[in-house]
A protein has these predicted regions:
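Non-catalytic peripheral regions of nucleotide-handling enzymes
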Residues: 1-85
Length: 85
């Protein structure tokens, strides 16, 4: 069953030159072994205080998790948006 967090679940993430390398999920380190895709979303820029500017990363970890992470580019925080089965 796919798990989805519409607002994102904060995760401690380490990035190398802006590319996520690992993150912690439930206290377990997840090393990213493959990046499947990445894209940016920049919307609601016309509404002060409501701008959404994110960079999404679909990744595979060394624990065989397929995940969708994103970095909020306004706050520099990393969040987990989805875990796929």
């Amino acid at each position: 069953m796919t798990r989805l967090w519409p607002e994102g679940e904060p995760v401690e993430t380490w990035a190398e030159e802006g590319v996520p390398a690992r993150f912690y999920w439930n206290g377990v380190p997840q090393h990213i072994i493959h990046i499947c895709n990445r894209w940016r979303v920049h919307t609601r820029w016309w509404e002060p205080g409501h701008t959404i500017w994110r960079e999404y990363w679909k990744v595979v970890t060394d624990k065989d998790l397929l995940c969708l992470l994103y970095q909020d580019l306004l706050s520099s925080t990393w969040l987990l948006a989805r875990l796929y089965d």
